[in-house]
Amino acid sequence: MGRTSRTTDPDGAPYRWELFATKTARVVENELDRCLRERCTTQYEYDMFISRVEARLERASQGGLGGSDDEPSPDPVVSQPALWETRWSFKKRRELRLYHGEPLSVPDLLFGLKYHWKRLDGLSADEIESAQNAEMAEAATRYRASSCYSSADEQPHPN
């Protein structure tokens, strides 16, 4: 049987978020800021989006995601078995994605790896899939380069 995301398991909570960073940059934190600045037209809209993101991350840290259509549990990333995908849908077809890892060696960690907007406008279905797969691959590369990654994290997700 495959794994389910920690973000849906309150028995193991609380979990802690750690965001991928380098010695010189808060990479994932900066990605989220860049994503929101790119798409938000007012400070109010930025603040609203960031509050929705932070609220979901807090619920995830308590193992409280899933169970509703408004806030589904993270989906396993089939092409990158060590990753999970959390989705936010904002008005005007704006689809924010976060890929995270859940290292088996660190049972209380949710490791944020990559934020991006899913590109939809003017692209074919194949182009959308290719662009998203590239984002997933970048997240997987970051994870594999981290000290908390192990090959055991690559267990296939359930179908």
Predicted regions and their residues:
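Active-site-proximal beta-strands of protease catalytic cores
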Residues: 113-114
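Basic, Lys/Arg-enriched alpha-helical interface segments
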Residues: 1-95, 105-108, 117-159
